[in-house]
Amino acid sequence: AGVRIVVGHGHGPSTNAFQEMKEEAEEKFGLSILTAWTFAEDERLRYQNDHAGANETSIVMAVRPELIDFGQVKEDESNLIGVAGGHPIRESSEAFGNEILEYTMKTLISGIETEYKKIKER
């Protein structure tokens, strides 16, 4: 009985909010709060916190390339309104998107399996 696993959205501000609640949730409720990046070791792939930048653009290129229209992106970085992170034209690629997706899934599956074993032992 009781809550054993809570899954939440893990992007940007929500990840930070989960991290801020971590200690209190563990003390008050015995609940472990883990983010998608709790288990990540590769620093280059660990913090994927951009908005329409190279990270998100690369993921879309890997999954739905027909949605990408670089004609809408200005080369001048000072005019990239609404973009945070690496430059979407110069730093994005389908290969990087696939690398991000594969690493994320591998890391999450491994981490969740490890945590699930701990939960079962409680």
Q: Over which residues does each language-model region extend?
A:
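Extended, histidine- and acidic-residue-enriched regions that form the cofactor-binding/catalytic faces
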Residues: 1-122
